[in-house]
């Protein structure tokens, strides 16, 4: 059992506010786009909560994708949005990579994403990620008990982050 440090707790509270705002905005869209927006917001929460590295990667992908996609035409973007939400999406085997962003975001969202990234970097720099520290304690206990632990992570970025943390500590 672990408790989030204040910096992480505040980040998650800010993220939840962003998600609530996104859900309110989605109410004005058609059902297909609403569904996409909900999946996108859920993926964002999962990424940020998985690890600082997964969150940073996802947020940076959203910023970069939206910068690159500004030149694309609307039909191409809409086609990608709806393809992303095929009913079989959950059966895909590559749920271990951070999803790419398909929704266009405005400059205020980009600023917010950059603020989230800065906070996630601050969490890493201050060693304020209690979840990875708890994982380290469990791995140490397992190793000291003669076991060979395997740590499963949802995202590749999280697996690399946890692996690096364990090796360094």
How would you describe each model-predicted region?
Residues 1-169:
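Helicase motor interdomain insertion/brace
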